[in-house]
């Protein structure tokens, strides 16, 4: 079967307004999603992951250690290894983020440096 889901589910029912629009307070309580993106608060997380093609869960109650918001599909060759939860070494943030994206949020950062 599928691997056990990582992270914790966020109950977004509290934030649903009329229709599909969610109005969020300007609260700064960052959380990190399993897509390795930092959301400014839980409400924004709900608003922005509502229409994702896969379920995003909450990885941690802080900003992400490795931010996967801006990275390219073509990665450079620089070597700053990151260890993925799949036990693989990724040569740098870019290749790690691409793997996270492909895995639909099932791979997360195990540690900085080689596994």
From Swiss-Prot:
Keywords: Disulfide bond, Protease inhibitor, Repeat, Secreted, Serine protease inhibitor. The record marks 77-78 as: Reactive bond 2 for elastase. The keyword Repeat applies. Disulfide bonds join 12-46, 24-43, 32-64, 68-97, 75-94, 83-115. This inhibitor is composed of two homologous actively inhibiting halves: one which inhibits trypsin, the other which inhibits elastase. Three very similar inhibitors found in the submandibular glands are secreted into the saliva. The sequence shown is one of the two main inhibitors. This is Double-headed protease inhibitor, submandibular gland. It comes from Canis lupus familiaris.
